Amino acid sequence: MNTAHSPDGSGRTGTARVKRGMAEMLKGGVIMDVVTPEQAKIAEGAGAVAVMALERVPADIRAQGGVSRMSDPDMIEGIISAVTIPVMAKARIGHFVEAQILQSLGVDYIDESEVLTPADYTHHIDKWKFTVPFVCGATNLGEALRRINEGAAMIRSKGEAGTGDVSNATTHMRAIGGEIRRLMSLSEDELYVAAKELQAPYELVVEVARAGKLPVTLFTAGGIATPADAAMMMQLGAEGVFVGSGIFKSGDPAQRAAAIVKATTFYDDPDVLAKVSRGLGEAMVGINVEQIAQPERLAERGW
């Protein structure tokens, strides 16, 4: 494990072991986007393992356009005080000062998120400089390993946020899983070439090839709107689920939230899945990913 970049003697930076351990505690759970303390309480009551505090869910960000930034500190603190479960908040890609502010507010995790407008199109945040663990998105294994090398303690497959269309989430999860399986079949000398192709450090590539999994927790996100969506992503190898617009843009948020939590737990039991899928009211209308122009796709942000 690489702890060379994470000295903790000063007390100001957390070790990789501690940060990754905090993310591990969320495994098997659902993390829900919330915009008010009331929504946060609904999410907690439904069984969410954490909430993501933000001013606009991805569907609204997509619809309204403009520059999307870190949420107001008052709003984040209101949600922190409303619930007992961990609270995450989003910072723009590369915006290390937004991350510094979020850490000072006492959030439990920071999501360096492509849902917000990137602040830097060259650099991501140096996440080793922070005590708080970071979550980052990835569409493939190379992207995931680059974020881990920068200090990310959890990876989420990106999907396409704010659409209610799960197709990109499945594409990204399958890509990460397929590339890991390919690494496992390579010889030691072939891993050098693979590291170059993935644009990732050789040591991390070897660690993944030997373990058959990422060295951090892997969640899924982007377009999950039904219990069946959540269960499918778990069956594809996700260790937990982020749900954004899919809950509070639906007809009965409390019931849908509880159903998605149950589906994530019992993801391989079709009888339970059939039961929790009944009578949920209308799902979010959503957008077909194929109808979104390439420059408008949030998953393309990040490098």
Swiss-Prot record:
E.C. code: 4.3.3.6
Residues the record marks as active site: K90 (schiff-base intermediate with d-ribose 5-phosphate)
Pathway linked to the protein: Cofactor biosynthesis; pyridoxal 5'-phosphate biosynthesis
One family name in Pfam for this protein: SOR_SNZ
Binding site for D-glyceraldehyde 3-phosphate: R174
Gene Ontology terms for molecular function: pyridoxal 5'-phosphate synthase (glutamine hydrolysing) activity
Top-level taxon in the UniProt lineage: Bacteria
GO biological process: amino acid metabolic process; pyridoxal phosphate biosynthetic process; pyridoxine biosynthetic process
Binding site for D-ribose 5-phosphate: D33, G162, G223, G244, S245
Entry keywords, A to Z: Lyase, Pyridoxal phosphate, Schiff base
Top enzyme category: lyase
Catalytic function, reaction form: aldehydo-D-ribose 5-phosphate + D-glyceraldehyde 3-phosphate + L-glutamine = pyridoxal 5'-phosphate + L-glutamate + phosphate + 3 H2O + H(+)
Family to which this protein belongs: Belongs to the PdxS/SNZ family.
Role summary: Catalyzes the formation of pyridoxal 5'-phosphate from ribose 5-phosphate (RBP), glyceraldehyde 3-phosphate (G3P) and ammonia. The ammonia is provided by the PdxT subunit. Can also use ribulose 5-phosphate and dihydroxyacetone phosphate as substrates, resulting from enzyme-catalyzed isomerization of RBP and G3P, respectively.
Subunit description: In the presence of PdxT, forms a dodecamer of heterodimers.
Name this protein carries in UniProt: Pyridoxal 5'-phosphate synthase subunit PdxS
Organism field: Mycolicibacterium paratuberculosis (strain ATCC BAA-968 / K-10) (Mycobacterium paratuberculosis)
